[in-house]
């Protein structure tokens, strides 16, 4: 039995999230259907991180176990032949038995892309979040970035946890959060050990409230300390959320995430010290 890791990229707008559902309209259903057509047998997959409906992925990782013998690129080419245009396998690699797409991961990076202004941009539908602001007004990016820093470190993130979250513990470690502005765009990069259900979107809801001046910078600390979902802002839209990268120990030698050459990475690399 051989363990294969696959790097997956997808546009989540048309899907009901990652996890398989009876109606079949999920990314996992699309991927496993394509694998079955290519390999001729069912090949269940294990994912690094389940994404919600409407959330995109630049660097999702899954693993599967198989008796089939194929060259790595054969998995890429063969599976992609049966996938819809909104999902693609970017790479494939044979892995040791102790590799696990979820439990071997030690870091996950999310990006959120947000626009603001008096009118929405139709060409960005489903690809970026949007905040309607009157002409001449903007989000206070500096306040958003300052407020976000209280979340860095190991904390109980119950205030940012969905009611239906199945995680055993609300305690997670946040490695870094950066908020950057570019014209009518705001980009947020969040790195952590792991994330609770809706955690990033709930953090975004609070950041937007602060950016609009509806809450002070200090409010983020109050929300965190409350350890109650009702203390935080409403869950923000999924449209601009991207699972950018899943980090593993160097010993596994997995390919670099395509996010490394993306617009998002470029925005943050322009700022010294990031």
Swiss-Prot record:
Coiled coil regions, renumbered to chain: none
Record carries keyword Isomerase: yes
Active-site residues from the entry: 52
Domain of life assignment: Bacteria
Catalysed reactions, semicolon-separated: uridine(38/39/40) in tRNA = pseudouridine(38/39/40) in tRNA
Residues noted as binding substrate in the record, renumbered to the chain: 110
UniProt keyword terms in alphabetical order: Isomerase, tRNA processing
Protein's UniProt keywords contain Nuclease: no
InterPro entries in the record: PsdUridine_synth_cat_dom_sf, PsdUridine_synth_TruA, PsdUridine_synth_TruA_a/b_dom, PsdUridine_synth_TruA_C, TruA/RsuA/RluB/E/F_N
Pfam families: PseudoU_synth_1
GO MF annotation list: RNA binding; tRNA pseudouridine(38-40) synthase activity
EC number: 5.4.99.12
One example of a Gene Ontology biological process annotation: tRNA pseudouridine synthesis
Annotated family: Belongs to the tRNA pseudouridine synthase TruA family.
Function: Formation of pseudouridine at positions 38, 39 and 40 in the anticodon stem and loop of transfer RNAs.
Subunit structure: Homodimer.
Name assigned to this protein: tRNA pseudouridine synthase A
